[in-house]
From Swiss-Prot:
Belongs to the serine/threonine dehydratase family. GO terms for molecular function: glutamate racemase activity; identical protein binding; L-serine ammonia-lyase activity; pyridoxal phosphate binding; threonine deaminase activity. The modification N6-(pyridoxal phosphate)lysine is found at K48. This is Serine dehydratase-like.
Amino acid sequence: MEGALAERVGAEPFHRVTPLLESWALSQVAGMPVFLKYENVQIAGSFKIRGIGHFCQQMAKRGCRHLVCSSGGNAGIAAAYSARKLGIPVTIVLPEGTSVQVVRRLEGEGAEVQLTGKVWDEANVKAQELATRDGWVNVSPFDHPLIWEGHASLVRELKESLGTPPGAVVLAVGGGGLLAGVTAGLLEVGWQHVPIVAMETRGAHSFNSALQAGRPVTLPDITSVAKSLGAKTVAARTLECAKECEVLSEVVEDREAVSAVQRFLDDERMLVEPACGAALAAIYSGILWRLQAEGRLSSALASVVVIVCGGNNISSQQLQELKIQLGCS
């Protein structure tokens, strides 16, 4: 390994320690302290840089000469940023409906961008084909132990900030990488008793479907507007997570997720994408209250942490269009 590359590979992780702040507005809605883990302020715009950055650094150590990543947006941006930092070429394969702003961001990071297929799963087939080339390595957006290991850093930060465990952690599930990473982190710090509320939108609810079936299942199509959650088949590891920790799977409608995005913008002055709105809907749509009423969550939660996962796949114009499309007030 050349000296300059060795220095970049051996450097600090590419992710930053993100703020954990109590939200007065969401705490008022929930009736309990709500802490927001602001992963949307990561330099690559989402939590994905934790796991993907770690993966790419490890692959560079092993002599990777070209990275390729299929993505709905966030994973690709994390891979492109990591590749630029490492000085390694990268190809990002996106579904054809990906927004222009995401494509421009990727090209700005120096990535080659290819548009293939209607949904992420189809783009992923192309990425896997490209990864068969000599020296190329496929960067899974969510399904690799190194990815989960990187995401686990988020929980170590939670422990350092909070000291004591929260009553629950709320997160969005797409392919399941964040869920797998948070599970790994909870086990690592001894917080395995902390429930995870795993939120999805209907039409991208591959984890909920897998839990009901007891095995990974493939959705016929991704019909949700939360395209960042658009994996038709969730990682098999997520089913193991549900056995290792208490995982409560909940599904909300697109309208609830988009309404949560608007309310969060008004409350916290931050624009996040519908995938993140799915997690926020646990508060805004009263999911936590219902889980408490059903006895599935403690009626006396000391606090709740909501992971604000990212905001790359949204603009003010897109938000207005989604509100009109879904009939949001």
